[in-house]
Amino acid sequence: MSANMHIFENPSALAEALADDVGARLAAAIAARGTASLAVSGGSTPKAFFRSLSRRELDWSKVTVTLVDERFVPPENDRSNHRLVADNLLKDGAAEARFVPLYQAAETAEAAAAIASGRTASLGAPLDVVVLGMGTDGHTASFFPGGTRLEEALDPTTPRGVITMEAEGAGEPRLTFTFSSLQDAGYLVLHIEGSGKKEVLAQAEASGDEAEMPIRAMLRRAASPLQIYWAP
Ligand SMILES: O=C1O[C@H](COP(=O)(O)O)[C@@H](O)[C@H](O)[C@H]1O
């Protein structure tokens, strides 16, 4: 079992503890530099965590929130990660936070990625907190097995920023921060729930190619220790 494994009795206990830990990191960044940055994942797992975090007492006006990855769909779309964050995180005190979306109303995903790279550069580097998720295929962010630009996304020499990704398991074209943008976050979290994902994590921790299970790049090569939060 990983040295940085945080195990909870249930998803609500996890959501509260992760919100406490992320809130404390953001508060420390604000105290040190006057601002804080947070990149979160989409999908079904982070909803309860988002709701808990939105209630944490912080000077949210000094926090900038963005996404680790996004579908190339407008925020009105049910599958938009922007929409998930707007509905569950950017409320209560956290409504004061600045949100920088990855989706941009551009003609192509490539054009949107270029705009998103420029806009997210204002968050500075490294990011203070990054919360990753993981799919049962071993993807994290939009680093999908078989992804069109997986090699480039995982290459540590690829610059910080947002690139496009297409993959069979991804549905829509995606926008994703590169590995280099995420791996050195001040607090780097992997949030997973359920016995299925615990088994996937165990598989990822065993030997094998990063291309088969891209989460391995974070487990093996991230400059910051990956803090794994899990509940059944
Ligand atoms: O496609 C995505 O899926 C992963 C995992 O989602 P979940 O529904 O299994 O929690 C997520 O981390 C990523 O941000 C999202 O775009």
UniProtKB/Swiss-Prot annotation:
Belongs to the glucosamine/galactosamine-6-phosphate isomerase family. 6-phosphogluconolactonase subfamily. It is an enzyme of class 3 (hydrolase). The gene is pgl. It holds the Pfam family Glucosamine_iso. GO terms for biological process: carbohydrate metabolic process; pentose-phosphate shunt. It comes from Rhizobium meliloti (strain 1021). One of its GO terms (molecular function) is 6-phosphogluconolactonase activity. SUPFAM superfamilies: NagB/RpiA/CoA transferase-like. This is 6-phosphogluconolactonase. Keywords: Hydrolase.
